[in-house]
Amino acid sequence: MDKKKYIITLDEGTTSCRSIVFDKQAKIVSVAQNEFTQYFPQSGWVEHDPLEIWNTQLSTMQSVKNKAQIKSVNVEAVGITNQRETVVLWNKETGLPVYNAIVWQDRRTSEYCETLTKHVDKVREKTGLIINPYFSGTKIRWILKNVPLAQKTLKAGKLLAGTIDSWLIWKLTGGKVHATDVSNASRTLLFNIHTMDWDQELLDLFEIPRSILPEVKSSSEVYGYVEPSLWSQRATAKVPITGVAGDQQSALFGQLCLKPGMVKNTYGTGCFTLMNIGEKPIMSKNKLLTTVAWKLGKKKPVYALEGSVFIAGAAVQWIRDGLRLIYDAAESDFYANLASKQDTHQVYLVPSFTGLGAPYWDSYSRGAIFGLERGTKKEHIIKATLESIVFQTNDLIKAMSSDVGKKIEVVKVDGGATRSEYIMQFQSSISGVNVIRPKNIESTALGATFLAGLAVGYWKDLKELEKLVKVDKEFKPKLDKEKVEKLVHGWNVAVKRTFNWMKEVDLK
């Protein structure tokens, strides 16, 4: 029988659940992935079914173990990384949700957020965040105010709330552990990033009882144990859950951005640029967020500056599934290169389908395409879609550079869209940075794997990890300065024209 030990990491994303088996060399042994349903009950609303997420995640965990042909006794530890801000409220006796999960992209609390303008500075100082529908606090409040079953369950003392990591930990441990990690907690608007605890003043502001919230732990410690029967009927192994981090912080760790000033960008459904800023939180002057990156056991927490783009890879999904301009995301590079060769006119697509994230934070912006001419073909729209991902990321890189007072030279990248050579090269040229793509672009899952492994001594220290991450390709800037300035200027004009759209036309 195989006596080797492995780590299984559960990577619960916005559109799919995956489980990955990693070995001691941080190599992927097997992967299982299944998509789950997206619900859009009203304009600007986005929901998931928490039970579907749980069942999907569980089935990938079971099948990835079987694919790797290992038993639960071969699993040293489990890591969890997850879509952040998305919230679930459930009954602790029945284990059933009282409402669908409200997803990070959901904008239903926009108007409520506007009523809190006088609290903006206080909230920012305590949490490092801005008041925005994106974060968990206003979503939890909405469920408590609008869902009778939530109110009834709360009155009965049976209600629990949490982000997706908490929901999965609770289910995996058979309801024994209600916990979250510092990186996920720091995305709720309820967590004080200086005291590293839930903040009573913020709980009062958002009218959320502390009793329903999870215990906050470090990102790398023993949380509890996976119920043996979840692996298989005959399993008896006690496998600990030892690494937990929100997806973007997990990717920062997985890219080994361990020193202040190191930057990574993840190209997923959205785009997320994070910079390690060390053990002291810096507040951005450019509307970036300050967030907890991770905390290793009893060590001091590490902080990050973060810029979030809501729609990145999701824009490519839209031209594939909504507009049907392509059959497969992989085709988009071909069409973008085709349009580049024609170089007749520049089209800009601003994919603010759910508003704009950093550094604009405009909930009322909506998507638009600019520069259309009679000669515009589908390849121009496809090229503009890919370039929109780059322009949005460039906005974040420039804001970060300004906040820390020095030019960013290198950006490490990961996520699905890094497979696009067009996006990677254009990013390097537009931002004037060297873009480094690692061999293993699964940095998000790798981060939680490293966190889980460190907690149980699977890897002994950070030095050992540094030998495990290998570079696939480095992209260097190719466009001249004048061309870049012209392209970026056009993007800036296009973005501004989408501001406040929903408010001005009042299309609710």
Curated annotation (Swiss-Prot):
Positions of ADP binding: 14, 18, 269, 313, 416
Broad enzyme group: transferase
Activity regulation note: Inhibited by fructose 1,6-bisphosphate (FBP).
Binding site for ATP: 14-16, 269, 313, 317, 416
Substrates-to-products reaction catalysed: glycerol + ATP = sn-glycerol 3-phosphate + ADP + H(+)
Keywords: ATP-binding, Glycerol metabolism, Kinase, Nucleotide-binding, Transferase
Database matches in NCBIfam families: glycerol_kin (TIGR01311), PRK00047.1 (NF000756)
Family to which this protein belongs: Belongs to the FGGY kinase family.
Name used for this protein in its record: Glycerol kinase
Species name: Mycoplasmoides gallisepticum (strain R(low / passage 15 / clone 2))
Organism ancestry: Bacteria, Bacillati, Mycoplasmatota, Mycoplasmoidales, Mycoplasmoidaceae
Gene expressing this chain: glpK
